[in-house]
């Protein structure tokens, strides 16, 4: 039986290696031809003129990921705390399946919800303040991604909080701490590794999300810090143009995938380092 387990593990490793080989073998030549600095810091993406700069899409990906974290992390963490320590059993029986259902909803359905509900709401509210915007924007994508990462953060954080020995809570209460104080000063810090894991997983999903973002972000590759302006992320750029790209254009899109892969790798390595430091 151990041979079967070994083969399964080897298959997983082989899949990762093959993906890395494909990305770097096809992406690095494009970076060399375009110029790494020009590729990473170029402000214009015009395949028709052989101009390939992905800085706008890098920044746009960071903007909507940061926005999703600002929206999703507080809500997700507080919901996890409520479900672990405050929620009545009957309400928990309803709330838990709902959060699990959120995780199973396809991205395209989230995108449709954002396009029909979130985008018009932003357009309407902006109009009240005299702003003429389409609604497809950084803000719309951030709100939608904030909702999409909730089940990941809630599920992992709740499991981490429930894994903390009850003796921690009982000891804090015995020393005179109130219920809220025992939770936020004892239980939550004890579960910080698991909570951080949930946040990192949520960030990973946000930065790599494609279909939902395409439907609400506006898909305009440009440099902007305006939350009400349309943007294009790295994954969206790959999906929108890969179908007809050839030659250097295709290789530049694969190189964009390399940059996205490195982003995810940095996030995971950062989490690993932080986890080791906290365990030391």
Language model features with spans:
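Glycine/proline-centered hinge or cleavage motifs at structural transition points of membrane proteins
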Residues: 106, 175-176, 189
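Transmembrane alpha-helix signature in integral membrane proteins
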Residues: 54-82
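Interhelical loop and adjacent transmembrane-helix boundary motif
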Residues: 213-261
């Amino acid at each position: 039986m151990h041979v079967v387990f070994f083969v399964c593990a080897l298959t997983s490793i082989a899949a990762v290696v093959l993906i890395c080989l494909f990305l770097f073998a096809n992406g690095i030549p494009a970076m060399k031809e375009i110029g790494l600095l020009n590729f990473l810091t170029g402000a214009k993406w015009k395949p028709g003129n052989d101009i390939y700069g992905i800085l706008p899409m890098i920044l746009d990906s960071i903007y909507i990921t940061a926005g999703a974290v600002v929206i999703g992390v507080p809500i997700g963490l507080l919901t996890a705390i409520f479900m672990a320590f405050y929620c009545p059993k009957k309400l928990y029986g309803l709330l838990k399946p709902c959060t699990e259902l959120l995780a199973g909803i396809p991205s395209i359905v989230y995108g449709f919800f954002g396009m029909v509900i979130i985008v018009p709401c932003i357009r309407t509210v902006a109009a009240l303040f005299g702003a003429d915007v389409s609604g497809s924007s950084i803000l719309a994508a951030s709100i939608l991604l904030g909702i999409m990462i909730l089940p990941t953060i809630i599920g992992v954080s709740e499991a981490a909080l429930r894994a903390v020995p009850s003796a921690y809570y009982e000891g804090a209460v015995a020393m005179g701490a109130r219920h809220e104080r025992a939770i936020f000063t004892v239980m939550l810090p004890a579960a910080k590794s698991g909570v951080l894991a949930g946040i990192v997983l949520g960030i990973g999903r946000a930065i790599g999300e494609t279909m939902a973002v395409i439907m609400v972000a506006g898909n305009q590759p440009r440099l902007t810090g305006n939350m009400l302006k349309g943007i294009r992320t790295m994954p969206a750029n790959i999906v929108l143009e890969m179908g007809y790209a050839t030659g250097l254009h295709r290789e530049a899109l694969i190189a964009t995938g390399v940059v996205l892969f490195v982003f995810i790798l940095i996030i995971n390595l950062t989490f690993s380092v932080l986890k080791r430091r906290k365990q030391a």
